[in-house]
Amino acid sequence: MNSKKRAYVSVYNKERIVEFCQYLVEYGYEIVATEGTCKVLTEAGIKAISAHELTGYPEPLGGKIRALHPAIYTGIIANELSEEQLSELGDKDIYPIELVVVNCYPFVEDMEAGVDFKEAASHIDSNGVALLNAAAKNYLHTVVVCDPDDYDRVLCDLAAGAI
């Protein structure tokens, strides 16, 4: 089993994501990211693995189904204290994901700003919601970060060894 910690990053709001991920790398995290986020990170010199590269499966439907793959979803939801689950992950070459950084498309803000409903609805983020739900379900073993305003707090907790 891979001893490196893994973070999954999929953000619509890319504000401060480069700085945040740089610190995650310094704290020993391997970054896995959706295509757009991965591009931003790698262009900034941060080593990141695309979800496509991890799963060996391209993002179908123009990226509408990015993360709903067992190699990602199972890695998030697995209990790292369960030898049985860790063994199953190892058998399938899946690694735990300890930190999930996801923020979703701002559907409500678009609607409030008067964006056409069909246009706004086409951007509803089902992937991000599923990832956040999986991480929340595994709250004892997975850190969930869904707001860039929380980056500093998470980094402080990492520095203090609280995570």
Regions found by a protein language model. Give the residues of each.
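N-terminal glycine-/serine-/threonine-rich phosphate-binding loop
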Residues: 1-33, 37-54
